[in-house]
Amino acid sequence: SMLSVLKNLGKVGLGFVACKINKQC
């Protein structure tokens, strides 16, 4: 469903932001 897709994108987005902040990419 669209909701599950958005949730997955949100998880990926948060992971990417945390990666950038921590500079541990």
From Swiss-Prot:
Main location: secreted
Gene Ontology cellular component list: extracellular region
Alphabetical keyword list: Amphibian defense peptide, Antibiotic, Antimicrobial, Disulfide bond, Fungicide, Secreted
Keyword 4Fe-4S carried by entry: no
Pfam families referenced in this protein's UniProt entry, alphabetically: Antimicrobial_2 (PF08023)
Coiled coil: none
InterPro entries cross-referenced by the UniProt entry: Antimicrobial_frog_2 (IPR012521)
Compartments, as annotated in UniProt: Secreted
Function text: Antibacterial activity against Gram-positive bacterium S.aureus (MIC=50 uM) and Gram-negative bacterium E.coli (MIC=2 uM). Has activity against C.albicans (MIC=70 uM). Shows no detectable hemolytic activity towards human erythrocytes.
Family: Belongs to the frog skin active peptide (FSAP) family. Ranatuerin subfamily.
This protein's name: Ranatuerin-1
